Regions:
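Conserved N-terminal Rossmann-fold NAD(P)-binding element of oxidoreductases
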Residues: 33-37
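Dinucleotide-binding/catalytic capping subdomain of oxidoreductase cores
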Residues: 2-32, 43-144, 148
């Protein structure tokens, strides 16, 4: 057990130096981290992850990264910030989420909030209207799933 966040960060910096100097073993390269959520849990996990050599990529790049030569990713980790459209297709079958598509049928108060909350409201009100795609499009390409939801 690590006694403090400061000590954990020191350990991660040591690991970062080793990855930079020696690379990752080819058997585990590329090492791809997928982060869900946009709150404090996900933010804290990303804060620690970002102490390591890394590159963030969009989810649309995951399949090509998985098939790329291991040497391309030997000295850094890959991070992907997962969005609602990476989890499910919208009711229209589109992976592009729009505000107009996600008005809640529930009598909820009008809030001034980011569009993601409108999407979540609609999803929780009508989950069967959405088609799951995460298990097919994203999960097979991840080494580590960090659940920040």
């Amino acid at each position: 057990m690590v006694p403090s966040v400061a000590k954990a960060k020191d350990i991660m910096r040591d690991i970062a130096s080793s990855i930079t100097a020696n690379g990752l073993p080819p058997a585990i390269t590329p090492m791809v981290f997928g982060f869900t959520g946009a709150g404090n849990v996900s933010g804290g996990a990303r804060e620690i992850f970002e102490l390591l050599p890394h590159e963030y990529v969009p989810s649309s790049a995951l399949a090509s990264i998985a098939s790329s030569p291991p040497s391309r990713w030997s000295n850094k980790l890959v991070g992907c910030l997962l969005q609602p459209q990476d989890m499910v297709l919208s009711p229209s079958g589109s992976s592009a989420f729009t505000n107009a598509e996600y008005t809640s049928p529930l009598p909820l108060p009008a809030l001034s909030c980011p569009p993601i909350y409108n999407i979540l409201r609609s999803y929780f009100a009508n989950p069967t209207s959405y088609t799951p795609v995460f298990h097919r499009n994203v999960l097979p390409h991840l080494s580590v799933l960090v659940n920040g939801m």
